């Protein structure tokens, strides 16, 4: 399978830029891994259906694969404690 291309939302790019260097390195390696296999993350359910989450230790990368365009849209990166609430807020515009 061809490696997917990453598309970062402005919010995801901003969040990655603010991470500590060791976490940033871990997140980048995890993104590279999910670009090779976009289905490797967990499917989200309920109001977050259609999105996936990839674990990077205590952090989560929330993304949406697009097989037709061979892209992966990275929506958010954050600590597992609050990333899903942040995603809900992002999706509802709050």
Put a short name on every predicted segment:
Residues 9-11, 29-31, 52-56:
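Short, functional N-terminal and low-complexity linear motifs
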């Amino acid at each position: 399978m061809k490696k997917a291309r990453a598309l970062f939302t402005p919010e995801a790019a901003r969040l990655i830029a603010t991470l500590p260097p060791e976490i940033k390195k871990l997140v980048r390696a995890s993104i590279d891994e999910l670009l090779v296999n976009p289905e490797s993350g967990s499917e989200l359910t309920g109001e977050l259906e259609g999105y996936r989450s990839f674990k990077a230790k205590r952090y989560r990368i929330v993304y949406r694969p697009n097989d037709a365009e061979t892209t992966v849209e990275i929506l958010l990166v954050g600590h597992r404690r609050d990333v899903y609430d942040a995603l809900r807020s992002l999706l509802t515009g709050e």
